[in-house]
Amino acid sequence: MASQPPQPPSGQPDTQYEEYQSEVITETTNRPTPAADVYEITPTNDVMDDRYEHEHDDYESGAMYETVRTWSPQSRPELVRIASVFSRIDSHPDVAPTTEDGGQLNRRDTLAGVKIGDPVLDPTKPEFDFYKWARMFTHVMEKEGIKRNRTGVMFRNLTVLGSGSAVQYQDTFLSPFAAPFRPGELCGKGRNPEKVILHDFNGAIREGELLMVLGRPGSGCSTFLKAICGELHGLQKKKESIIHYNGVSQHTFKKELRGEAVYSAEDEHHFPHLTVGQTLEFAAAARTPSKRVLGLSRKDFSTHLARVMMSVFGLSHTYNTKVGDDYVRGVSGGERKRVSIAEIALSGAPICCWDNSTRGLDSATALEFTKALKIGSQVGGITQCLAIYQASQAIYDIFDKVIVLYEGRQIFFGPTRIAKQYFEEMGWYCPPRQTTADFLTSVTNPKERIAKEGYENRVPRTAVEFERYWKQSQNNKLLLADMDRFEAEYPPEEGHLEKLRETHGQAQAKHTASKSPYRISVPMQVKLCTVRAYQRLWGDKSSTIATNISQIMMALIIGSLFFDTPQTTDGFFAKGSVIFFAILLNGLMSITEINGLCKATDPIVPNAQRPIVVKHVNFAFYHAYSEALAGIVADIPIKFLLALVFNIIIYFLGGLERSAAKFFIFFLFTFITILTMSAIFRTLAAATKTIPQALALAGVMILALVIYTGFTLQPSYMHPWFKWILYINPIAYAYEALLVNEVHGNRYRCATPIPPYGSGTNFACAVAGAVPGEMSVSGDAWVESSYDYSYAHIWRNLGILLGFLAFFYFVYLVVSELNLSSASSAEFLVFRRGHLPKNFQGSKDEEAAAGGVMYPNDPARLPPTNTNGAAGETAPGGSTVAVIPPQKDIFTWRNVTYDITIKGEPRRLLDNISGWVRPGTLTALMGVSGAGKTTLLDALAQRTTMGVITGDMLVNGRPLDSSFQRKTGYVQQQDLHLETTTVREALRFSADLRQPKSVSRKEKYEYVEDVIKMLSMEDFSEAVVGNPGEGLNVEQRKLLTIGVELAAKPQLLLFLDEPTSGLDSQSSWSIVTFLRKLADNGQAVLSTIHQPSGILFEQFDRLLFLAKGGRTVYFGDIGKNSETLLNYFETHGAEPCGPSENPAEYMLNVVGAGPSGKSKIDWPAVWKESEESRHVQQELDRIQSETSKRNEGHGQSAEKEPGEFAMPFTSQLYCVTTRVFQQYWRTPSYIWGKLLLGLTSALFIGFSFFLQNSSMAGLQNSLFSIFMLTTIFSSLVQQIMPRFVTQRDLFEVRERPSRAYSWKVFLLANIIVEIPYQILLGIIAWASLFYPTFGAHLSSERQGILLLYCVQFFIFASTFAQMIIAGLPDAETAGGIATTMFGLMVTFNGVLQKPNALPGFWRFMWRVSPITYTVGGLAATSLHSREVKCAQNELAIFDPPSGATCAQYLQKLVEAGAPGKLYNPMSTSQCQYCPLSSGDQFLGGSEIHWSDRWRNFGIGWAYIVFNIFATVALYYLIRVRKSSGRPNRIISVITYHLSQFGTYCRAFITGRKEKCPRKREQIGKIY
């Protein structure tokens, strides 16, 4: 039956509308006059604001302040500017502060009974009170006449558009070939269509108000906040949309006052190596005003301000702790979130928008954060908007207004106190104990909302109907009237803009443009960022030192490689090589400046810090080019010192001329080259959006720079189509300058005169530039003849280099400023082609899909309120959960203790915890932040890899066996999945490998379909997991995580770690109720839960509550309406829990959770002595006794499935290899990137060395072309390792602990899958390089051998990459090691320094380098038996003695077996002798022989086999052995107790014998 268009209920009381109208009118007409200048706030227990009354008026509900508005609109004080007053008074107690007009502020002046010197005003004291501090701050600021900006915001007809569709298709390796058959997509038709994200929003937020933004994920909350702050980045507003700040348009406001409206994103971006104190002091310093109270210095002001915010947000103890990230150890996740909050607070912006900033915070901390926002709004007039997903009633009551979003449509905007009544009068039912915020969000969820009886056909259903109802409501009319008054009060661009400019100008430093949004000048910004750069370097000094040491080691190696180079013509090639090495290593060491993978772990890397710079630019901390310039300034001294040490070593050890003048020229050019290449790499990083883009371009650029330096390919041999690269190559100019600098003015003794017995003018030196009859060769003549270089070019080249340097630095600064933002797009699902569900629509009617509304008289549809609690027998999608196999096993743990050692100091994480989980029960694991909830879960699930665990863990009274982990499910907090797999494939993979082999594949897949129905995943079962924003959303990922564990059919129990983390209230409700259904069907469930609402909390049967230090506070039943739990706490001295209070929040408050929470009662000690604790021990004894008897009765016939894995090795290998093949096939960017790298590099090399002639230089160039092919090796390795890490992370974090498959299978599968693609790559490189370079004249045998070598080389590269990354933690570390090893292999392969010229202690490196055999085999096959035809400058030209022919004169030389060839034997003058006659003679100088081709090929395969075995061995030794095995655990226990020997002895001596280890309690049974 079609529903009627919803209308506002005409028969409903309109008292709320009258009250709202009177509030708006009162607020507008009763505004204070400019004469008053005091803003008073007095504590009260009645109401938070005289305009809005609340149902809950206790302290915890946030109703704690009454506002008397007597401030002046022109002089409302700033919230965070008074801190310096207290620091001055505390440090100089005898100095009375003076005001701007010279008057004194008496030290005994008080405000509401608070003295300035009170410890409650000192953020370093435990008595500090932010509320009182802020009030006194206001008072002093008013006295000194310092103003701050304040403004509200009004938005009318706000519509935001984005690009993207609700669904896209997954690309595969063949997608580019299929594109021509889809012309619509190829031409852009139907691709990235315009999508309306926000529809026609209206509202007004006055200064000092708090707005709560509610909506489900994807409803547009983040976009709304970004629109308010003007941070849309790629999204667009409609022309009709209006946003203004007290009359100032958003365009003008963002241009001149950008930092006055800031947006706090949900993700945290900080420099991990900075401490919390450094991070916040930087933020404070960047926004420190020019006019400060008492004239304090900027440093004192910013330091004190940072201390205040650290105290407010509970960060004082982390002042000297690194912020950290996923890779760098630092503060906890919750503390890092608070750092982000404090950073925003320090910006001093009058408009702040917070996007789910309470995520990851426990309820007590989230409440304190919201209270701090309220104080800021009331005292400082800050306008704040906060999007929040799980808000308690106490948090909700703090807000002034609320906006509710439904699929991008506004369905309510108004005071928080009338919102609930509005929706109830609409016809929706709010269950008891459901918070108002949850209720408001639930009405947007068809699966959760409940219609009142009699309203079933009157309530709106779709988002459009809700919006229509809102626009026709009286509340909307009052809102529009209030907006009209707002606009009348603040006419566009009249007056208020000048006031804002005036106040902003007062805060600006000298030499800052008046219309600049920044408070400090550019030089101050550069200085501040430079100091921060050095702080980051110091914080990561180990990495900096390691990098510098590696560079110095390379200098020592290269220098020693050319040690004692002869000062003869035989040393010409060596001199060119060492200078080539020096200039390349100096220039290319800066490539690390485009590394870091956007994690900000590299101290001065542009791309790594981009998200942080973008954030700070939006906060108006500094210009992006200021940070870029600071990076340059900070980097120059470090580069100078490193270059000095590096070049001293390589210059003097490498045999270059020991002349002070030449050394300083050498150093000058190398240092300028370092800076120039640094500027180029920085520009490349700044101009690209992602690290892979930058690295891909850098790889191509480096190849071009190396080839066209002038050494590997001499200028005269360059082809015109690429020769232009020589003229834009900075390294080429530096190489020419260094080479001519070295040989200028020198003469070198001829090492090979032709003939050696010649005299007078009857001989010549077989070197370019030689003069007949001279026994030495001029260095200037040699470089001019060989390279066309001239000493006259040296200073010209310096000028060109400086020009390059200035140009690229300028471009870098410009690009850094302009290329910051990234485009935003709408979220979408990704499906495999041909697998889109038939009923899937991009914008479907969720109401219809959910089967209509819910009714309050249907018990099966009501949220359960009892502890038995199933909400009927249907899962979220209505399917049964009866497929869960029944369970009978009881898991118990007793006196579990977990100790680890940190920096040599022991630390106890879990302290004698006991409990159990029965089948059919849902047990909650809760605790304060840092209590060890996840740690306990990991310990119970046998997933810890370090430390010592003691205690008893039993299943049915028996010790855990090797099958325990595969018989349990563990839902991790992080939703880790392979991004290329579909939902159904992920579930089938889990079922295939984790269900017993006795179950057929058909049965497994049928069970997977049951799981899909249980979790209501039918609509996206064929969707690809993808990445956030391009794939499954947060809720769908969490469902998949749970589904993967259910698909394994856990026989014992199901562990869950924070299954509701990051979800909105309705999604959390869906997850927890599903767990309730699982428990009701016999599943044993143990779940940690972070911030449960009262209704969610009542779904659990039992609770294990932990305090800090992993100590038990409570373990037992929760009881109906939480009576058992509450009775325990109240019996032992806690305040009674209010009837409307959330028991979960009550518990946290009782034990003193939150940054400033304290409890007078030691609850863990109370528990230890309680009757309930003794009952737990008795019950454990009883359970163990009963299960032991039952085990004895069954004897050895009890059901048991021994074995670590459910499936045999071959089945594991088949499944895993198939999945890895699938992953590669569905990652076309990786495969095509690999193939294009090989194709473009090989073609570029081939056409650079196109058809080289048979001269000696031509042969050398041909050898260099083969050498250049091997340089692809490094880029290939860098591509492979991140792919391996992705697979390994998933395996080690989820699949190995679950015992899905063996680590040996994981390694073999990854090795196997790479091989076909490496074979294809070898074929492409072979065809692209060797045909252009050597032509098609080679025999088929030789071409076949070349192909085999190419394929072998690329297979070696893949196995080498896997060997290096196998045991290392991340791709960055492995990349550094691989690059170093590759450098050694390339250096010692006999091309750049002939083997016979190597110092004796380095010859072994030539023999062990794998590249030696690859180059040897390729070169021998390519150049064997090739006739040498010397170029004119390569010939030894001389006259024979009078009367003799050339042949007669050289007869002795020929008879002695000289390798050369005489071109004019019958001539009597100008004999032309070529030193070589065949390619084999040329190769022989590098000890490359045609006869060794198959030996070299065999050695190559030996290296591949070695790589594979080494991969397995390294992975086992580093990543398997250390984390598994009983002997290692025993060793850990012994080591731990030995480390505690001194402690035990001291305790014994002092009589504290209880500290000594007791056999049972402290050692226990080792697992």
Swiss-Prot record:
<dbReference type="InterPro" id="IPR013525">
    <property type="entry name" value="ABC2_TM"/>
</dbReference>
<feature type="transmembrane region" description="Helical">
    <location>
        <begin position="661"/>
        <end position="681"/>
    </location>
</feature>
<feature type="transmembrane region" description="Helical">
    <location>
        <begin position="636"/>
        <end position="656"/>
    </location>
</feature>
<keyword id="KW-0067">ATP-binding</keyword>
<keyword id="KW-0677">Repeat</keyword>
<dbReference type="GO" id="GO:0016887">
    <property type="term" value="F:ATP hydrolysis activity"/>
</dbReference>
<dbReference type="InterPro" id="IPR034001">
    <property type="entry name" value="ABCG_PDR_1"/>
</dbReference>
<feature type="transmembrane region" description="Helical">
    <location>
        <begin position="1231"/>
        <end position="1251"/>
    </location>
</feature>
<dbReference type="Pfam" id="PF19055">
    <property type="entry name" value="ABC2_membrane_7"/>
</dbReference>
<feature type="glycosylation site" description="N-linked (GlcNAc...) asparagine">
    <location>
        <position position="895"/>
    </location>
</feature>
<feature type="glycosylation site" description="N-linked (GlcNAc...) asparagine">
    <location>
        <position position="149"/>
    </location>
</feature>
<comment type="similarity">
    <text>Belongs to the ABC transporter superfamily. ABCG family. PDR (TC 3.A.1.205) subfamily.</text>
</comment>
<dbReference type="InterPro" id="IPR003439">
    <property type="entry name" value="ABC_transporter-like_ATP-bd"/>
</dbReference>
<dbReference type="Pfam" id="PF01061">
    <property type="entry name" value="ABC2_membrane"/>
</dbReference>
<keyword id="KW-1003">Cell membrane</keyword>
<feature type="glycosylation site" description="N-linked (GlcNAc...) asparagine">
    <location>
        <position position="819"/>
    </location>
</feature>
<dbReference type="InterPro" id="IPR029481">
    <property type="entry name" value="ABC_trans_N"/>
</dbReference>
<feature type="compositionally biased region" description="Polar residues">
    <location>
        <begin position="22"/>
        <end position="32"/>
    </location>
</feature>
<feature type="region of interest" description="Disordered">
    <location>
        <begin position="1"/>
        <end position="37"/>
    </location>
</feature>
<dbReference type="Pfam" id="PF00005">
    <property type="entry name" value="ABC_tran"/>
</dbReference>
<dbReference type="InterPro" id="IPR017871">
    <property type="entry name" value="ABC_transporter-like_CS"/>
</dbReference>
<dbReference type="InterPro" id="IPR043926">
    <property type="entry name" value="ABCG_dom"/>
</dbReference>
<feature type="transmembrane region" description="Helical">
    <location>
        <begin position="691"/>
        <end position="711"/>
    </location>
</feature>
<feature type="binding site">
    <location>
        <begin position="927"/>
        <end position="934"/>
    </location>
    <ligand>
        <name>ATP</name>
    </ligand>
</feature>
<dbReference type="Pfam" id="PF06422">
    <property type="entry name" value="PDR_CDR"/>
</dbReference>
<comment type="function">
    <text>Pleiotropic ABC efflux transporter that may be involved in the modulation susceptibility to a wide range of unrelated cytotoxic compounds.</text>
</comment>
<feature type="compositionally biased region" description="Pro residues">
    <location>
        <begin position="1"/>
        <end position="11"/>
    </location>
</feature>
<keyword id="KW-0325">Glycoprotein</keyword>
<feature type="transmembrane region" description="Helical">
    <location>
        <begin position="1305"/>
        <end position="1325"/>
    </location>
</feature>
<feature type="region of interest" description="Disordered">
    <location>
        <begin position="1172"/>
        <end position="1202"/>
    </location>
</feature>
<feature type="transmembrane region" description="Helical">
    <location>
        <begin position="571"/>
        <end position="591"/>
    </location>
</feature>
<feature type="glycosylation site" description="N-linked (GlcNAc...) asparagine">
    <location>
        <position position="1253"/>
    </location>
</feature>
<keyword id="KW-0813">Transport</keyword>
<dbReference type="InterPro" id="IPR010929">
    <property type="entry name" value="PDR_CDR_ABC"/>
</dbReference>
<feature type="glycosylation site" description="N-linked (GlcNAc...) asparagine">
    <location>
        <position position="912"/>
    </location>
</feature>
<feature type="glycosylation site" description="N-linked (GlcNAc...) asparagine">
    <location>
        <position position="157"/>
    </location>
</feature>
<dbReference type="GO" id="GO:0140359">
    <property type="term" value="F:ABC-type transporter activity"/>
</dbReference>
<keyword id="KW-0472">Membrane</keyword>
<dbReference type="Pfam" id="PF14510">
    <property type="entry name" value="ABC_trans_N"/>
</dbReference>
<feature type="transmembrane region" description="Helical">
    <location>
        <begin position="798"/>
        <end position="818"/>
    </location>
</feature>
<protein>
    <recommendedName>
        <fullName>ABC multidrug transporter MDR1</fullName>
    </recommendedName>
</protein>
<feature type="domain" description="ABC transporter 2">
    <location>
        <begin position="891"/>
        <end position="1134"/>
    </location>
</feature>
